């Protein structure tokens, strides 16, 4: 019987047999970098070589963290090297914790320091905006508010002597009434300033007619342009109505401006 001839295999087949199919994973460290080389099969069942490069950096950590990293691993990671294993461990997003002391916590809970809270308060609808920007300005809600304030101011002026409280001098002399040459009570005159240039007599009458009856109104106008100079005088028939007008209109928002209302100073004859 003739002898069986030995067929020599190729070098690649011998290497594949020696490594059991795939070469082992290797790790090398050079110049502060760690290179991990591994082999695997791709979708076409061909061997591929994958090289991962890691940059080695030193980090100062608390003692408890450093001690925890020396704990003995167990389970499937019993024989793993120090550090996370990509096959069994997934590193998630880093979360930074911030600790506040008691003083910072008190400041955070202070309602006055809260930027989300608006310090402005509307006098018409009690909203968190200035009265000049109120969407209900000039509507029935604004008119009702002015009527309520006028009634409250008039009632306070009448009931003040009965209650025994302090009565301003102008209310004490309201019954006397200093009449002028034309029968007009100059002590019941007020001056309204900070009016817009587009102000008209009709607007002025609309502004004060709900407070009380008037005997005369004067809107200062420029002789050349005919525009409002920014102030006006209103003479009420009763001094208590003039006092109510000052209480209601002083600081009131009108036509994107804040009105300033005060008693009219008597002219020196």
Swiss-Prot record:
Domain of life: Eukaryota
Keyword GTP-binding: no
UniProt keyword annotation of Lipid biosynthesis present: no
Record key words, sorted: Cytoplasm, Initiation factor, Protein biosynthesis, RNA-binding
SMART domains according to UniProt: RRM (SM00360)
CDD domains, A to Z: eIF3G, RRM_eIF3G_like
Cellular component GO terms, alphabetical: eukaryotic 43S preinitiation complex; eukaryotic 48S preinitiation complex; eukaryotic translation initiation factor 3 complex
Residue stretches making up the RRM domain: 188-266
Record-annotated disulphide pairs: none
Gene Ontology BP term (one): formation of cytoplasmic translation initiation complex
Localization of this protein: Cytoplasm
Chief localisation class: cytoplasm
Gene Ontology MF term list: RNA binding; translation initiation factor activity
Family (UniProt): Belongs to the eIF-3 subunit G family.
Function: RNA-binding component of the eukaryotic translation initiation factor 3 (eIF-3) complex, which is involved in protein synthesis of a specialized repertoire of mRNAs and, together with other initiation factors, stimulates binding of mRNA and methionyl-tRNAi to the 40S ribosome. The eIF-3 complex specifically targets and initiates translation of a subset of mRNAs involved in cell proliferation. This subunit can bind 18S rRNA.
Subunit comment: Component of the eukaryotic translation initiation factor 3 (eIF-3) complex. The eIF-3 complex interacts with pix.
Protein's name in the database: Eukaryotic translation initiation factor 3 subunit G-1
Record organism: Drosophila erecta
Upper lineage: Eukaryota, Metazoa, Ecdysozoa, Arthropoda, Hexapoda
């Amino acid at each position: 019987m003739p002898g069986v001839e030995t067929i020599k295999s190729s070098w690649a087949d011998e290497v594949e047999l020696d490594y059991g199919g795939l070469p082992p994973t290797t790790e090398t460290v050079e110049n502060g970098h760690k290179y991990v080389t591994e082999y695997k099969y791709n979708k076409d069942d061909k061997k591929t070589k994958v090289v991962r490069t890691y940059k080695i950096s030193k980090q100062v950590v608390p003692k408890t963290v450093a001690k925890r990293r020396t704990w003995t691993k167990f389970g499937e990671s019993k024989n793993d090297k120090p550090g996370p294993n990509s096959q069994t461990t997934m590193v998630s997003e880093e979360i930074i914790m911030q600790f506040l002391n008691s003083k910072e916590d008190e400041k955070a809970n202070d309602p006055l320091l809260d930027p989300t809270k608006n310090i402005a308060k509307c006098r018409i609808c009690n909203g968190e905006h200035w009265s000049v920007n109120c969407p209900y300005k000039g509507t029935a809600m604004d008119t009702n508010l002015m009527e309520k304030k006028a009634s409250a101011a008039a009632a306070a002026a009448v009931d003040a002597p009965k209650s025994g409280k302090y009565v301003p001098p102008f209310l004490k002399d309201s019954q006397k009434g200093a009449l002028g040459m034309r029968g007009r009570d100059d002590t019941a005159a007020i001056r309204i300033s900070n009016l817009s240039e587009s102000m008209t007599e009709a607007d002025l009458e609309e502004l004060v007619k709900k407070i009380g009856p008037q005997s005369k109104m004067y809107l200062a106008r420029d002789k050349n342009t005919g525009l409002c100079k920014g102030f006006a005088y209103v003479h009420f028939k009763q001094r208590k109505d003039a006092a109510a007008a000052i209480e209601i209109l002083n600081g009131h928002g009108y036509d994107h401006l804040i009105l300033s209302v005060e008693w009219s100073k008597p002219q020196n004859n």
